[in-house]
């Protein structure tokens, strides 16, 4: 498409594209915005190297001729990103059909970065949202991210570790992610460690010698309760040298039953401080079930179903042209029609006002940022008979903030702990009804009345 724009001499036409998704993942009441730092790094460093140009030069069309003109390749060689970018910050709670990112500039540049931006936003937002749901279901327990082995490739595992930490995990077993992103690291030994020694007890003793300050013992290699007895023996040996066993891990079987039996036996032996760690294909629903069964698990090791977004492996964010600047220098709004109402985009360069009342979010209103007149009424895009008005009792904030200005980065990315805290703050302001794992109450997101009327008028005109 970039080549086509260049070929038809409209490549410098000013445009605005918006990123949004049509449905909250996991049937959740919200999503967690994540991936912006990767997008910033990509946009801040995008260029065409000699190697890139040589590869593009080698491509042939079906008739055997060069796919691209030499002049176009020269043009790409001098490429310099020059767009404006506005985005919602990482760690904010977001909702379907809201503009998450606006990219504004020459249409060939906006089009060029589409796939990379969607890729980075989609996956990271999925994982952060999944981690958040697991964190909420654990009711504040420690969650360890154990997903490296099951993640979709090395790059996927690194992104997943970062997004999981933002979403609510406490530590990661991915040491490289710990190094790159300053995430606390933690891990346990595997069954192979136990099998490498003549007995389970010997393996536990040797592990405690190597890791006296970070010792978590996996007790289900042969028999969980026998393994617990061996762990208790090692815990008592550690106490003799003023050390403490951190925990015992159960990776199979009836986790609720076994955790209760283990807790009782540990407490009987004066080891109330030893934590019980559970793993084995956990997700937010199994955590909730185990909580309801009053299991004695206080640390959750989660891998596969977190880092693969197991039950919703694609977010489905889209990137739509919403405005073009005309020869008079004014913006013409653009809209894509569809037989499916959900696929009709909001036209224009849009911003979001998030309203707050009594320390709770009250609703998000999408409005046209080029329109000086903004009403106090928003309309449900799926049912025009439903609306909400925001009076002076509500305060508000604009969600999309400037990231790039004419290609220059003007935003400083916060550290991960700050992003994580931002999410915690947002979740406190989100009513509990929107945070239910199943059948959450819909958070109010609507279109400002003037924008709604204009959108409706555009649809009717195009369908004449």
Locations of the language-model features?
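Ordered alpha/beta subdomains of enzyme catalytic regions
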Residues: 1-213, 244, 319-464
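Glycine-rich phosphate/ribose-binding loops and adjacent secondary-structure elements
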Residues: 192-367
